[in-house]
Amino acid sequence: MWCLLVLLCSQEIAFSSGFTTTSTLNSDKSQYRKTRNPECFMNVSEVIRYHGYPSEEYQVTTEDGYILGVFRIPAGRNSQNTGQKPVVFLQHAFLGDATHWISNLPNNSLGFLLADAGYDVWMGNSRGNTWSLKHKTLNPSQKAFWQFSFDEMGKYDIPAELYFIMNKTGQKDVYYVGHSEGTTTGFIAFSTYPELAKRVKMFCALGPVTTCPHATSPLIKITNVPETLLRLVLGSKGAMHQIGFLKGPVTQLCTSLDKFCGHVLCYIAGGNVKNLNTSRIDTYVGHSPAGTSVQNIIHWHQLTHADQFQAYDYGSKENMKKYNQSTPPAYQIEKISTPTAVWSGGHDKFADPKDMAKLLPRITNLIYHEHFPAWGHLDFIWGLDATERMYQKIIELITKYF
């Protein structure tokens, strides 16, 4: 859920350190000879092609008018097979984007591994992030553009993307892999639309988050303030987007002080820096945070205090108008019959094991669950051992349920 706020914090702390620790940096001039990874400044398609894979990009329009950037890896690096293949859809976490799945080298990035394993890989982008800032009638300068949270992402974005992909490929069904908020939107979409859920052959949930009262990240504590104060500080439009003029200094600093930036990530998200490829951290911060709406941030803030997985709380008066009841309705996860596999981490500061224990019994068709005691929230997408411990199992399960 909140995991990519980690990267924002990393940028702010590291950038500040660059001006207050000059003597430290100068003490080892060899640091400056480190070269940034070129992917820092590439878009999604460029990253894919840089590693030798074919790339396609599309714009998908939702029922409520948002235009989403969707990226495709139609074949593996050395594959000559251009025919139909099973489709795997990957949905990123809060404040993330499609680059999450291709940020490491090909042998450690799920998007590339799936393509090499013979799958047609599609990567979504939530409304309001770097690649989904368009609308049929609105623009990002308008407050109305930003009136959404993960509720709308689940009810509009995910269905639009999946149906577009099935129509484009001719496939009758897809496999869905989500991380953090990407699982949240999956749970909403599949519980809201049973017919869509029937066309999802398997749902792989990595570090899933539905409620988070036990989240231990210091970032949660920082934002644990009254909702009115959050609105006063953040405003009412978008937040946490990339700041153009900071991208160069931040990526350079996280190249020179890669372990420092890695420790910041782990301090906030959990896990151990030894399981991160610190030579890639400049790439991570080069694309994140990718932005979202303040309303989405508020919705997550509400779930840190809620005892159930529920829709956005507008207040009793507005709730009556929107939901015909004074409180937000709960999402009915139990209605989902899709085969679901879950991976969780013991040191995950956002998807805490206590909250996971509450979620798992609600998953009606839980076909697999694996818990990694040492993993934090970022290990699912960037862990050095993720290929061996999880990605290979995902491919194995997808093959089994083909």
Regions found by a protein language model. Give the residues of each.
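Cleavable N-terminal signal peptides of Sec/SRP-targeted secreted and luminal proteins
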Residues: 1-18
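Conserved alpha/beta-hydrolase "nucleophile elbow" surrounding the catalytic nucleophile
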Residues: 92-94, 174-183, 345
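Short beta-strand/loop motif that positions the catalytic acidic residue
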Residues: 336, 342-344, 348
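Short, surface-exposed "cap/lid" segments of acyl-processing enzymes
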Residues: 62, 67, 71-138
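Short alpha-helix in the alpha/beta-hydrolase fold that links the catalytic acid
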Residues: 338, 352-361
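Catalytic active-site module of serine/aspartate enzymes centered on a nucleophile-bearing elbow/loop
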Residues: 368-402
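Alpha/beta-hydrolase-fold enzymes
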Residues: 15-25, 167-172, 181-321
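Alpha/beta-hydrolase active-site loop
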Residues: 144-168
